[in-house]
Amino acid sequence: MKKTFTLADANRTLPLVSRIVRDLVARYPAWRELVEEYELLTSSQRADAPDPRVEQLERQVTAVAREIDGYIHEVTELGAEAQSPLDSGLVDFPGVHDGRSIFLCWRLGEESIEHWHERDGGFAGRQSIGALEFADR
């Protein structure tokens, strides 16, 4: 069963979540650059003349991807969900309000959780937390 957060619980996890997401956001551009370089190199590579850099790039892409997966796993282990694109710094915390499932929505750089959205609403459906009444504020 998935963990659900009260607003206070989610806010208490933010110092740790923030550190993890900061690391994730910092590594993501390096991974994208490596993937783009790999794709460029392999698209122009001839079968009869393999480029020795391809194998090295594959190892680098894999290593950085594992690092990023580790950060995502850490966020997931806490009960939250890192959102795509990964460099957005968005994290959703499953919650319940008035008997319905919602997400408490946080973005890297925000000091506390100030937004929420319906489960199917996504970032575009973000609304101010002030619009909801939470007993645990």
Question: What do these predicted ranges mean?
Answer:
Residues 1-44:
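Long, hydrophobic N-terminal alpha-helical segment
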Residues 31, 45, 78-82:
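Short secondary-structure junctions and interdomain/linker hinges
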Residues 45-57:
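A short, surface-exposed helix-loop junction/capping segment
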Residues 27-29, 35, 49, 86-89, ...:
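Residue-level signal for alpha-helical context at structural boundaries
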Residues 17-34, 57, 61-64, 68-71, ...:
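Amphipathic alpha-helical coiled-coil segments
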